[in-house]
């Protein structure tokens, strides 16, 4: 079977002529006197699995919520697939959002959870269930269609939430700490499932995480955030091998820092 080209294969961000799928320009979000996101500009390309990486309170989830429409920017613009989102409500954007809590309906079966959004929008039940069946195959949960969420493992619930987020075929899926509720072993297994699903569908994913290893494994590119700003954007190997600042080097970890100064000839000399 032919492999469909993804952003990971083509790396359009290396091409100055490539047109971004998402254009974020000078986005700022203030809550009173506190600036949560500070003048962020960012391009993301179609088919990417882009990670926003940073510690607690750095602004990454606020930036994600502004893309979804659940937070309104104080200033700046967000454009998705050529459309300015300034006056577009969350429910009319070509996006869907998956939360860390998964927010599954406990009284509904797996298949009814996935079908809920389709039926609510007026799709016929036979057509909706056909789409649900395709999603269940994709996330390998066909045998669990009639089970309730409490009868599933954490990893299975995560896949139900993912299927529900994708069944309406959004152009952009926003994932806020999607693996945060899983234990380490299950989180590592689920990372690769997430990559496979994203590449199969070709949907653009933006993932928020505080986990450096998760970002390095999942992403086509990473935007490292600190105090409301994006301090470095790059492919995982670039971020790891060439951190742009001491903060990035410390945050990514596994890096030896050597204090240097230049001598009179301009050569770098180690201190100490």
Question: Regions from the language model: what does each represent?
Answer:
Residues 76-84:
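Conserved ABC transporter NBD signature motif
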Residues 68:
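Helix-to-loop junction immediately C-terminal to a conserved catalytic motif
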Residues 61-64, 160:
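ABC ATPase nucleotide-binding domain helices that frame the ATP-binding cleft
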Residues 88-247:
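ABC ATPase nucleotide-binding domains
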Residues 244-272:
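ATPase nucleotide-binding modules
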Residues 53-55:
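The feature captures the beta-strand-to-loop junction immediately N-terminal to the Walker
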């Amino acid at each position: 079977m032919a492999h469909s080209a993804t952003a990971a294969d083509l790396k359009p961000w290396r091409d100055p002529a490539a047109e971004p799928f998402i254009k974020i320009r000078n986005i700022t979000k203030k809550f009173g006197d506190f600036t949560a996101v500070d003048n962020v500009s960012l391009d993301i390309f179609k088919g990417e699995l882009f990670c926003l990486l940073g510690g607690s309170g750095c602004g990454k989830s606020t930036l994600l919520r502004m893309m979804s429409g659940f937070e309104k920017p104080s200033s700046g613009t967000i454009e998705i697939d050529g459309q300015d989102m300034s006056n577009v409500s969350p429910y009319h954007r070509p996006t869907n959002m998956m939360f860390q809590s998964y927010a599954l309906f406990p009284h509904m079966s797996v298949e009814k959870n996935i079908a809920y959004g389709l039926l609510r929008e007026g799709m016929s039940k036979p057509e909706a269930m056909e789409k649900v069946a395709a999603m269940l195959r994709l996330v390998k949960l066909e045998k669990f269609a009639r089970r309730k969420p409490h009868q599933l493992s954490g990893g299975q619930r995560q896949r139900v939430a993912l299927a529900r987020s994708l069944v309406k075929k959004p152009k952009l899926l926003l994932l806020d700490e999607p693996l945060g509720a899983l234990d380490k072993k299950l989180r590592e297994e689920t990372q690769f499932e997430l990559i496979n699903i994203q590449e199969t569908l070709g949907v653009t994913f933006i993932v928020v995480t505080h986990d450096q290893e998760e970002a390095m494994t999942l992403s086509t590119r990473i935007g490292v955030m600190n105090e409301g700003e994006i301090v470095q954007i790059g492919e995982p190997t670039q971020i790891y091998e060439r951190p742009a600042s001491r903060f990035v080097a410390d945050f990514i970890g596994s890096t030896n820092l050597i204090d240097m100064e230049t001598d009179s000839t301009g050569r770098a000399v180690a201190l100490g």
